[in-house]
Protein backbone atom coordinates (compact mmCIF):
# COMPACT_ATOMS: atom_id res chain seq x y z
CA UNK A 1 0.00 0.00 0.00
CA UNK A 2 2.78 2.34 -0.82
CA UNK A 3 0.76 4.59 -3.06
CA UNK A 4 -2.45 6.48 -3.55
CA UNK A 5 -5.62 4.45 -3.27
CA UNK A 6 -9.19 4.78 -2.17
CA UNK A 7 -9.93 3.89 1.43
CA UNK A 8 -12.76 1.72 0.07
CA UNK A 9 -10.20 -0.47 -1.68
CA UNK A 10 -9.05 -1.63 1.75
CA UNK A 11 -12.01 -1.11 4.11
CA UNK A 12 -15.73 -0.68 3.63
CA UNK A 13 -16.43 2.33 5.86
CA UNK A 14 -19.42 4.32 4.59
CA UNK A 15 -19.77 5.83 8.09
CA UNK A 16 -17.14 8.36 7.00
CA UNK A 17 -19.79 10.06 4.87
CA UNK A 18 -21.31 11.36 8.12
CA UNK A 19 -18.23 13.58 8.45
CA UNK A 20 -18.23 14.75 4.84
CA UNK A 21 -20.32 17.95 5.28
CA UNK A 22 -17.95 19.19 8.00
CA UNK A 23 -14.89 18.27 5.97
CA UNK A 24 -16.37 20.09 2.97
CA UNK A 25 -16.56 23.26 5.07
CA UNK A 26 -13.06 22.86 6.54
CA UNK A 27 -11.02 20.56 4.25
CA UNK A 28 -8.04 20.03 6.54
CA UNK A 29 -6.61 17.00 8.38
CA UNK A 30 -7.18 18.78 11.69
CA UNK A 31 -10.92 18.82 10.97
CA UNK A 32 -10.95 15.03 10.81
CA UNK A 33 -8.97 14.69 14.03
CA UNK A 34 -11.25 17.10 15.90
CA UNK A 35 -14.39 15.39 14.59
CA UNK A 36 -12.98 12.00 15.52
CA UNK A 37 -12.25 13.22 19.05
CA UNK A 38 -15.79 14.56 19.36
CA UNK A 39 -17.18 11.23 18.19
CA UNK A 40 -15.10 9.33 20.73
CA UNK A 41 -15.93 11.61 23.66
CA UNK A 42 -19.62 11.57 22.71
CA UNK A 43 -19.61 7.97 23.92
CA UNK A 44 -19.97 9.50 27.38
CA UNK A 45 -23.63 10.23 26.62
CA UNK A 46 -24.82 6.65 26.08
CA UNK A 47 -22.47 5.46 28.84
CA UNK A 48 -24.05 7.82 31.38
CA UNK A 49 -27.53 6.94 30.15
CA UNK A 50 -26.70 3.24 30.55
CA UNK A 51 -25.46 3.73 34.10
CA UNK A 52 -28.65 5.62 34.92
CA UNK A 53 -30.77 2.85 33.35
CA UNK A 54 -28.95 0.27 35.49
CA UNK A 55 -29.46 2.35 38.63
CA UNK A 56 -25.83 3.20 39.35
CA UNK A 57 -25.10 6.04 41.76
CA UNK A 58 -23.59 9.34 40.62
CA UNK A 59 -20.15 8.46 42.02
CA UNK A 60 -20.27 5.14 40.17
CA UNK A 61 -21.32 6.91 36.97
CA UNK A 62 -18.46 9.39 37.43
CA UNK A 63 -16.04 6.50 37.92
CA UNK A 64 -17.19 4.80 34.69
CA UNK A 65 -17.02 8.12 32.85
CA UNK A 66 -13.46 8.75 34.01
CA UNK A 67 -12.42 5.24 33.02
CA UNK A 68 -13.89 5.82 29.57
CA UNK A 69 -12.24 9.23 29.15
CA UNK A 70 -8.80 8.14 30.30
CA UNK A 71 -8.67 4.73 28.68
CA UNK A 72 -5.70 5.11 26.32
CA UNK A 73 -7.16 2.96 23.56
CA UNK A 74 -10.12 5.33 23.18
CA UNK A 75 -8.58 8.77 23.46
CA UNK A 76 -4.90 8.11 22.78
CA UNK A 77 -5.30 7.45 19.08
CA UNK A 78 -7.22 10.69 18.58
CA UNK A 79 -3.98 12.67 18.92
CA UNK A 80 -2.14 11.17 15.97
CA UNK A 81 -4.37 8.91 13.88
CA UNK A 82 -7.64 8.97 12.00
CA UNK A 83 -9.33 5.59 11.90
CA UNK A 84 -12.82 4.21 11.44
CA UNK A 85 -12.49 2.00 14.53
CA UNK A 86 -12.91 5.11 16.67
CA UNK A 87 -16.61 5.01 15.78
CA UNK A 88 -17.12 1.52 17.22
CA UNK A 89 -17.31 2.23 20.95
CA UNK A 90 -19.80 5.07 20.74
CA UNK A 91 -22.13 3.23 18.35
CA UNK A 92 -21.95 0.00 20.36
CA UNK A 93 -22.77 1.96 23.52
CA UNK A 94 -25.81 3.49 21.81
CA UNK A 95 -26.89 0.03 20.61
CA UNK A 96 -26.63 -1.33 24.13
CA UNK A 97 -28.42 1.64 25.66
CA UNK A 98 -31.36 1.31 23.26
CA UNK A 99 -31.38 -2.46 23.71
CA UNK A 100 -31.39 -2.29 27.51
CA UNK A 101 -34.11 0.37 27.60
CA UNK A 102 -36.37 -1.42 25.13
CA UNK A 103 -36.07 1.10 22.29
CA UNK A 104 -35.66 -1.60 19.67
CA UNK A 105 -36.24 0.57 16.59
CA UNK A 106 -33.47 2.92 17.71
CA UNK A 107 -31.31 -0.10 18.50
CA UNK A 108 -31.83 -1.40 14.96
CA UNK A 109 -30.89 2.00 13.53
CA UNK A 110 -27.74 2.04 15.68
CA UNK A 111 -26.92 -1.53 14.63
CA UNK A 112 -27.30 -0.52 10.98
CA UNK A 113 -24.92 2.39 11.59
CA UNK A 114 -22.54 -0.02 13.31
CA UNK A 115 -22.43 -2.16 10.17
CA UNK A 116 -21.27 0.90 8.24
CA UNK A 117 -18.11 1.38 10.31
CA UNK A 118 -15.95 -1.33 8.78
CA UNK A 119 -16.26 -4.64 6.99
CA UNK A 120 -15.65 -6.59 10.21
CA UNK A 121 -17.99 -4.49 12.40
CA UNK A 122 -20.84 -6.94 11.69
CA UNK A 123 -19.09 -9.27 14.13
CA UNK A 124 -20.02 -6.85 16.94
CA UNK A 125 -23.58 -6.50 15.64
CA UNK A 126 -23.88 -10.29 15.40
CA UNK A 127 -22.82 -10.56 19.05
CA UNK A 128 -25.52 -8.04 19.96
CA UNK A 129 -27.98 -10.22 18.06
CA UNK A 130 -26.86 -13.27 20.03
CA UNK A 131 -27.22 -11.31 23.27
CA UNK A 132 -30.76 -10.37 22.28
CA UNK A 133 -31.55 -13.96 21.38
CA UNK A 134 -29.90 -15.83 24.25
CA UNK A 135 -30.13 -13.48 27.23
CA UNK A 136 -32.93 -11.04 26.47
CA UNK A 137 -35.17 -13.76 24.99
CA UNK A 138 -35.97 -11.49 22.05
CA UNK A 139 -35.78 -14.43 19.67
CA UNK A 140 -37.11 -12.88 16.50
CA UNK A 141 -35.25 -9.58 16.85
CA UNK A 142 -32.05 -11.34 17.91
CA UNK A 143 -32.23 -13.69 14.93
CA UNK A 144 -32.85 -10.78 12.55
CA UNK A 145 -29.89 -8.79 13.90
CA UNK A 146 -27.61 -11.84 13.87
CA UNK A 147 -28.55 -13.02 10.37
CA UNK A 148 -28.54 -9.51 8.88
CA UNK A 149 -25.09 -8.91 10.37
CA UNK A 150 -23.76 -12.17 8.93
CA UNK A 151 -25.26 -11.35 5.52
CA UNK A 152 -23.78 -7.84 5.55
CA UNK A 153 -20.39 -9.27 6.56
CA UNK A 154 -20.45 -11.59 3.53
CA UNK A 155 -21.50 -8.76 1.21
CA UNK A 156 -18.80 -6.43 2.59
CA UNK A 157 -16.08 -9.05 2.15
CA UNK A 158 -17.33 -9.80 -1.37
CA UNK A 159 -17.24 -6.08 -2.19
CA UNK A 160 -13.65 -5.66 -0.98
CA UNK A 161 -12.53 -8.82 -2.75
CA UNK A 162 -14.29 -7.82 -5.98
CA UNK A 163 -13.65 -4.07 -6.16
CA UNK A 164 -10.78 -3.50 -3.73
CA UNK A 165 -7.49 -5.08 -2.79
CA UNK A 166 -9.13 -8.01 -1.04
CA UNK A 167 -10.05 -8.68 2.56
CA UNK A 168 -7.10 -8.64 4.93
CA UNK A 169 -7.68 -12.02 6.53
CA UNK A 170 -4.00 -12.53 7.35
CA UNK A 171 -4.69 -11.18 10.86
CA UNK A 172 -6.64 -14.41 11.43
CA UNK A 173 -3.75 -16.68 10.40
CA UNK A 174 -3.38 -18.12 13.91
CA UNK A 175 -6.99 -19.29 13.74
CA UNK A 176 -6.96 -20.66 10.19
CA UNK A 177 -5.84 -24.26 10.41
CA UNK A 178 -6.79 -25.20 6.84
CA UNK A 179 -5.80 -22.52 4.33
CA UNK A 180 -8.04 -24.07 1.64
CA UNK A 181 -11.15 -23.25 3.71
CA UNK A 182 -10.15 -19.64 4.41
CA UNK A 183 -12.25 -17.88 7.07
CA UNK A 184 -14.53 -20.92 7.44
CA UNK A 185 -11.54 -22.72 8.94
CA UNK A 186 -11.41 -20.09 11.68
CA UNK A 187 -14.81 -21.15 12.98
CA UNK A 188 -13.69 -24.78 12.93
CA UNK A 189 -10.61 -23.87 14.98
CA UNK A 190 -12.66 -21.89 17.50
CA UNK A 191 -14.98 -24.86 18.04
CA UNK A 192 -12.40 -27.66 17.98
CA UNK A 193 -9.40 -25.93 19.60
CA UNK A 194 -10.53 -22.73 21.35
CA UNK A 195 -7.35 -22.37 23.42
Regions found by a protein language model. Give the residues of each.
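Short hydrophobic/aromatic helix or loop-helix immediately within or flanking a transmembrane segment
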Residues: 3-28, 189, 193
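Transmembrane helix irregularities
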Residues: 25-26, 38, 54, 70-74, ...
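Alpha-helical transmembrane segments of multi-pass integral membrane proteins
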Residues: 7-8, 19-20, 32-39, 64, ...
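Membrane-helix interface segments
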Residues: 28-31, 54-62, 101-107, 137-141
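Transmembrane-embedded, aromatic-rich helix segments that form part
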Residues: 106-116, 120-134, 141-148
Amino acid sequence: RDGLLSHFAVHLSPVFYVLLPFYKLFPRPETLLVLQSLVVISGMVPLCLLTRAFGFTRPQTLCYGLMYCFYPAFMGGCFYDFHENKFLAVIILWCMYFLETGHFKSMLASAALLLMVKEDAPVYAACIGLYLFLWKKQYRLGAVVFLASCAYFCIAIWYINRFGEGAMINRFDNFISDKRLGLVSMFKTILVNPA
